[in-house]
Amino acid sequence: MKRIAVLTSGGDAPGMNAAIRAVVRKAISEGIEVYGINHGYAGMVAGDIFPLTSASVGDKIGRGGTFLYSARYPEFAQVEGQLAGIEQLKKFGIEGVVVIGGDGSYHGAMRLTEHGFPAVGLPGTIDNDIVGTDFTIGFDTAVSTVVDALDKIRDTSSSHNRTFVVEVMGRNAGDIALNAGIAAGADDISIPELEFKFENVVNNINKGYEKGKNHHIIIVAEGVMTGEEFATKLKEAGYKGDLRVSVLGHIQRGGSPTARDRVLASRMGARAVELLRDGIGGVAVGIRNEELVESPILGTAEEGALFSLTTEGGIKVNNPHKAGLELYRLNSALNNLNLN
């Protein structure tokens, strides 16, 4: 393989630029030319494709976002869009593609491979909801951003004897909420993977007041409901105290990537080039127990929920390589809470 391309697709994540940099420089070291595709699959179909050099990725490793830009392009789910994209790639002499993004991006990469065009996926999403990897590019930075915000919210919460409901991102996964909540010492964490009762949340807050605690931080993952809806439900369940809502929003996607995300992205980017060099496509690179692994890309595009309740009321672990259930129980133990 003499020429490959790299694109970013879907929601941006800190560390994407570090991954692009690794792809470019590893490929050059292997004697492979690299082209960048602007705006994801939309740019592929439009032919917005250009050569990248080592200088093109200079000083990019610490930048948030993606300098190749990103976009959602549902038209690529159709065969016509896929074939149009492949036609453009062939015009530029490109023989393989590295796709950095989430599960929607992975589906596009799989379609390319099915049409005989090798594609390798890298998990770029703050949600950490990709099966086949312990961590995704951008997750660590997002958690750090949320923890920093929670520390600041705690300052004002304690000054006014208030309870704050803080809504965080994660789509249908509770990874950000769990990890940031543990790190920031949140009093309660609500995630979409497990059911809970608002009455129990109110009781736990009241128990805190009885023990002399004058403020509380409640984390709610966006996959549960909005922060405003959650606050309303708390009031309906009997909460009488001063209650405020903070929605952290898109600051969770921005910012300079942490050292961990930079290293992870660099390792994954280099591995993607090695796979394409060897003619391997249709796989996604992940990390498990600190070792790089590859998985069939179609399987990794499934929902990455950590765990869920069974019909009998037990807990089913959907991805044993993630520590979600352990963290949920840890938070309950640290705050003397009931599991539900």
Curated annotation (Swiss-Prot):
Pathway: Carbohydrate degradation; glycolysis; D-glyceraldehyde 3-phosphate and glycerone phosphate from D-glucose: step 3/4. It is found in: Cytoplasm. Its main location: cytoplasm. GO terms for molecular function: 6-phosphofructokinase activity; AMP binding; ATP binding; fructose-6-phosphate binding; identical protein binding; mannan binding; metal ion binding; monosaccharide binding. PROSITE patterns: PHOSPHOFRUCTOKINASE (PS00433). Gene3D superfamilies: 3.40.50.450, Phosphofructokinase domain. InterPro entries: ATP_PFK, ATP_PFK_prok-type, PFKA_ATP_prok, Phosphofructokinase_CS, Phosphofructokinase_dom, PKF_sf. Its cofactor is Mg(2+). ADP binds at R21, A22, V23, V24, R25, R154, G185, A186, D187, K211, K213, N214, H215. ATP binds at G11, R72, Y73, G102, D103, G104, S105. CDD domains: Bacterial_PFK. Substrate binds at T125, I126, D127, R162, M169, G170, R171, E222, R244, H250, I251, Q252, R253. Keywords: Allosteric enzyme, ATP-binding, Cytoplasm, Glycolysis, Kinase, Magnesium, Metal-binding, Nucleotide-binding, Transferase. Optimum pH is 7.2-7.8. Allosterically activated by ADP and other diphosphonucleosides, and allosterically inhibited by phosphoenolpyruvate. One of its GO terms (cellular component) is cell surface. SUPFAM superfamilies: Phosphofructokinase (SSF53784). The keyword Nucleus does not apply. PANTHER family: ATP-DEPENDENT 6-PHOSPHOFRUCTOKINASE, PHOSPHOFRUCTOKINASE. Belongs to the phosphofructokinase type A (PFKA) family. ATP-dependent PFK group I subfamily. Prokaryotic clade 'B1' sub-subfamily. Homotetramer. Catalyzes the phosphorylation of D-fructose 6-phosphate to fructose 1,6-bisphosphate by ATP, the first committing step of glycolysis. This is ATP-dependent 6-phosphofructokinase. It comes from Lactococcus lactis subsp. lactis. The gene is pfkA.
